[in-house]
Amino acid sequence: MPNSRNYTRRRVLSVAIATAASPASVLSLDAGGLSDRRIVAESRFDVTSAPLQAEVVQLVVDFPPGAWTSWHTHGGQAINLVLEGEITLRHAGMEHPHRAGQAWTDSSGEVHAAGNTGRGKARLLTNFLLPPGCTQTTAVQESPFEPAIAYEVRFPLSALPAETEIAQQVADLASGWRAQRASVGFTANIVIAGEVTYQIGGERKVYQAGEAWSAPAGTLVGEENRSAGTARVFTTCLLPRGTGR
């Protein structure tokens, strides 16, 4: 059975220290045309100490111009994907700008902060992978103008293989889109705009923006946009290294 949760809010956002991104593979579908499903952004990284990970977190965070996180550390690996605008990462006296479509990851405890130095809104998608008992965020110095967490969901993880990758993908689903697939690895999915109907195993439900589900590897998932408008989904998959989605 899928796990389904609405978002909760937290005051402090963690953002990780930068490394280069690598592209994620395209989701394999058995119905619908490619024009009906548009990949907006994606990333793929190795998971650090995969067998130790006990929880996955999905965050959708909005940065108004001038908003910055606290200076902070985090207790597990963070994977970050800029969806809109530009996010600047500060650490060790350096600044690293990341534009829409760029991603980075880190599992270090180094103190850092991230913010929006541009004129328009920025949106950041973050995954945390947390071992048992680890704190998601530890603030060192508070920010006077924090970004806003739009959505946050978390799901427990079963034991992962030592060689595991995490793939993030944001896709727009046109009205009338319909597809079915079997999940290759553990999958967590949150609707971030519009609504999508999912058939997950034996359960069928309409998911609104901010609602999420997870399913283990091998679960048959049906996906359908029955609304009049385009829907947007943020999907995280934990995959054996080298496999497609």
Predicted region positions:
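N-terminal secretory signal peptides and thylakoid transit peptides that target proteins
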Residues: 2-20
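C-terminal segment of N-terminal export signals and the immediately downstream linker at the start
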Residues: 24-41
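Conserved short histidine dyad/triad with adjacent acidic residue
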Residues: 57-73, 107-108, 165-183, 217
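Short acidic-glycine-tyrosine-enriched beta hairpin
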Residues: 92-109, 202-218
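Surface-exposed beta-loop interaction hotspot
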Residues: 134-160
